[in-house]
Amino acid sequence: MAVPHFSVSVVARGSGRSAVLSAAYRHCARMDYEREARTIDYRAKQGLLHEEFVIPAESPEWLRSMIADRSVASASEAFWNKVEDFEKRSDAQLAKDVTIALPIELTTEQNIVLVRDFVERHVTAKGMVADWVYHDAPGNPHVHLMTTLRPLTADGFGAKKLAVVGPDGNSLRNDAGKIVYELWAGSLDDFNAFRDGWFACQNRHLALAGLDIRIDGRSFEKQGIELTPTIHLGVGTKAIERKATTDDQAVSLERLELQEEKRAENARRIQRRPEIVLDLITREKSVFDERDVAKILHRYIDDPGVFHSLMARILQSPKTLRLERERIAFATGIRAPAKYTTRELIRLEAEMGSRAIWLSRRSSHGVRKEVLEAAFSRHSRLSDEQKTAIEHVAGAERIAAVIGRAGAGKTTMMKAAREAWEAAGYRVVGGALAGKAAEGLEKEAGIASRTLSSWELRWNEGRKQLDDKTIFVLDEAGMVSSRQMALFVETATKAGAKLVLVGDPEQLQPIEAGAAFRAIADRIGYAELETIYRQREQWMCDASLDLARGNVGKVVDTYRANGRMMRSELKAEAVQNLIADWDRDYDPTKTTLILAHLRRDVRMLNQMARAKLVERGIVDAGFSFKAEDGNRRFAPGDQIVFLKNEGALGVKNGMRGKVVEAAQNRIVAEIGEVEHRRQVMVESRFYNNLDHGYATTIHKSQGATVDRVKVLASLSLDRHLTYVAMTRHREDLGVYYGARSFAKSGGLIQILSQKNSKETTLDYEKATFYRQALRFAEARGMHLVNVARTIARDRLEWTVRQKQKLADLTQRLVAIGARFGLAVGAKTTNSQNLKETRPMVAGIATFPKSMEQAVADRLEVDPGLKKQWEDVSTRFHLVYTQPEVAFKAVNVDAMLKDETVAKSALSNMANQPESYGSLKGKTGLLASRADKQDRERAERNVPALAQSLSDYMRQRSRAEQCYQADELAVRRKVAIEIPALSPGARQTLERVRDAIDRNDLPAALEFALADRQVKAELEGFARAVTERFGERAFLPLAAKDTNGETFKTITAGMNPGPKAEVQSAWNTMRTVQQLNAHERTIEALKQAETLRQTKSQGLSLK
């Protein structure tokens, strides 16, 4: 039994749920949600195995006619839409939702019969409609059951509450004389009876299936099981206890020994599972290099060989993904280490983003307009921008973000928002990474707050849990790691709470920190606060507020009316017009920016804009500068952008500046504004992450403010990107677009108004890992071209390696198989005449480790090879001054792969050992006696080194062949299929099993021998079972059922699917082996009797 799970919840509008949406999801179907005039489509969801829509026997005619001639899903759609239409309240309870785990011991057909029995006894018998589906998740088969909360009447539905009838037939009244009512759908006592009824029904069906299993659904306490937390006294605690009876020196030595014990144990654990190191590193940083791995290993590993072996295993682990290759920087000649991350982190961040999008599309935590107006009236000094931000965070969506610099009024805004939430009946709590920030949030905004770690601790202890009436405000969100942010997003999602993220605009920049906050803000959008409105014109300020509220259509009309929406027929014409207008309006005393969403557009616009300035003589052709992405030319007056953080210069990724001096591979740039303005000198050999800054992506402009902005609109824009692009200016804004492409896609306003368009295909279950990796790198400001090339090249090289490995392995396996008499013969079948039958237990054809990996693992622990390698290592140390350098030069790996290379290397080593490195000691007149002795010793050991290495390679080759043969035999064995039995054979085996249970083995054998065809089929079945599992695998007492040790041993390492197949076929395989054993016993007795009679006859002749 996976889990004796039985949970009941209510589908209620108050919690943002819908009966139609729930039904569509469970039926994996497309349904029309009539109340909201929209369609829900879950047809892509998988796992639906069976579905039924069952009505009570005495159902009214309207219900019968409604579902007549409809499919199950269609009947469900029609019924729950009627329920939704009947319930008028905004917080109406619509249905009871029951989730039940099914016993994995039963077959699919048996589980369906079980659920039908339960529904008939405990649901429809009480006049309830039962809409249920069977989901077959691997290892977790379960049922979702939706039932009604109102009785059915002739024209619709009755009341949810009914008067309790007393013994006299009249309505029961309480002491105050009022009529007592009860819920028609049942109270807590009814729920307990409902739950107990399920377990009773389940146990009955388990017994009918011949399974000696009973499920007790009660709590541990009610079962009399005393589960108390145990206290683990570790070695450190014991050392402290012993300290009281020892002197100070003894305690000190004892603690040192304890430290070494811990290091040794950690070393062993890392060797068993090197991925522990990845877990340690990724708690601190999401992108790392070899040095980070080495730092962790150095804490615990002393042996150089083990150290380097673990380094290789970690960096080549399937869990590791290389984002950028190691490379020599062209401009500096400095070697940049390769950058890595883990697949788990990429998937975690992608899932976090998907959850954030899901929350943003849920409407459950809205605050009524009159409540907001009351809050605004109490805070008369709120600006329009602050009010707009409050409206944004107080919206119905279950997640929201707000951005504002320190002093921009975030605290005042959050205080007013808290009052509005509390007035609407919500509990508001907050958290921050640092205690000081949490304290400030509580003191200034009145939001009860703790550190994030404190919240996690309380949740793990079952305290202070969030619920669907909780608003959680997370301050300084840009400081929170992806892992921790993912936890809070997941917690809010599961608890039904609302999450409000508060951050700083600097944290929106694509730098190394704050990637989690950016990943969410980019997906859901945000409200923005500024101490001073950017726009100078009032109509522009009003338009920015409308953009913040999502009124994109109104804003487009406003800007069009003011001549700021520049229409062209084609995008190419729009680009030309944009550059022409930018050139005409260019004023060196004003800050300007061209914005586009696509990088290729940005690169083109930068080139065209600078070309115009050079053409007019505003800037010179300039001097060449070796930038990371190729040569650029810079001259005084050029606008530039920094693309990487550099503390020594005081610049950050996305920061803009203006060149004031330029020379070959050197510039002086002015950065900052007003009193923070300063100059920095940049030389390409020290910093080369620069580009022209006339145009930039909309993402990089987040948090920026300039005088004039030109925007190139594209079909990839959405509501959030439009908001960012159209609110960066102080004085003027122009939007340029090609009308033809927008017209084909629904129109300009529709495209600019769409929500999360760039995420409409982002589904964590289906999104490609490649795309997730690029988004992960983008959020950290990495060079996407380099990342894409690295991933693609690594994938290609891996594929080529696997192809060659497969070819080499095939040749080796054929040779080994022939040597061990395992020749492979070819079979031909007529596929048209062969009727495919699914086996009872499928053969295993895929394995968690490749053949090469499995053999390598055994070679790694081979004691003979270990001893031989120690001799090789010792000889290297005796012969060479730098043994590790010489070992690398010898390239043992290449020798192991190619016998010709090995012979050449061994010959070279014996005759010219100096070619691999300097020998130990010295010769000549100036050499000391010790040096001469070292050289003599080295020369004497050269032949021994070559011989030791040759012996090691020969011994390893033999061991490798042996292990390959063993592994091949094991894999061929588990690849054997256990065939399905015909109905006649199954019936015969059932009769055999009954006879065995009656201890009537002769009758069992008689049944088996009665039909020759069935007998032959059972013999083939038994042969397959023996070949795969062994002749007596199912005969011991421990193999009586699947609860014994035999089952655990046989299924060790299996995936849930194959394990379930073995479990299902267990009794059949055991029966056939018992039958075979009885046959062998009878045959042995016959032979013994024959031999006895022969001997007796021989004696009588004498």
From Swiss-Prot:
InterPro entries associated with the record: (+)RNA_virus_helicase_core_dom (IPR027351), Bep_BID (IPR041533), Coronavir_polyprotein_1ab (IPR050534), MobA_MobL (IPR005053), P-loop_NTPase (IPR027417), TraA_Ti (IPR014136)
GO function terms (MF aspect): ATP binding; DNA helicase activity
SUPFAM superfamilies: P-loop containing nucleoside triphosphate hydrolases (SSF52540)
Keyword Nucleotide-binding in record: yes
Residues binding ATP: G404, R405, A406, G407, A408, G409, K410, T411
Membrane-traversing stretches: none
Keyword Methyltransferase in annotation: no
Keywords from the UniProt entry: ATP-binding, Conjugation, Nucleotide-binding, Plasmid
Similarity field: Belongs to the MobA/MobL family.
Protein name as it appears in the record: Probable conjugal transfer protein TraA
